[in-house]
Amino acid sequence: MKLFATLAAATFAALSVATPTQAGTVEAYQLLKMIESTGTTVSLNPNSYDESCKGKAGYYVFEPKVQDIFVVCTDQVNVKDTDELWEVVSHESTHVMQACNGGLVFEEAYLPRTFRELERKAPHYAKLIDEKYTGDDTALEAEAFWMELQPPSHVLSYFEDTCLNKK
């Protein structure tokens, strides 16, 4: 929490002289705060601190009553790069949404559209999903990679609807 607050304060201070292209950083930290408000521990970890970070940009682990942690791996992610940070936070936040929803964020009927959009806008993601994931993980990761392509306002809205407004 202390690391998150320090990093957020430094980022917001930098934004006071930043260009408009860095606006996504505000949304990334807004989304991190929303994630934290669900009770999820949010952490920004270097590889030397977190063995699970090696080779990953980030990860989310949820085991009911055992573990609920969202991590951005700072050795692989330049947290000062707006796009890079947003991609990781939006992707991993989708897994938080999936945990809140007990499965996919959107109805399974939308998956073909999700895959078509990935093939059209981010064919490297479509190929990665096809080669690396199997079973239910395919659909879960497709949603997460698709979420990276969405405007920040949409991701924030999806998160709010899925995790914060759901009773």
Regions found by a protein language model. Give the residues of each.
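Non-transmembrane alpha-helical segments in soluble domains
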Residues: 32, 86, 90, 94, ...
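Soluble non-cytosolic domains of exported or imported proteins
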Residues: 25-26, 79-88, 134-142
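Active-site scaffold of zinc-dependent metalloenzymes
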Residues: 50-86, 99-100
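Short N-terminal segments immediately surrounding and downstream of signal-peptide cleavage
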Residues: 22-45
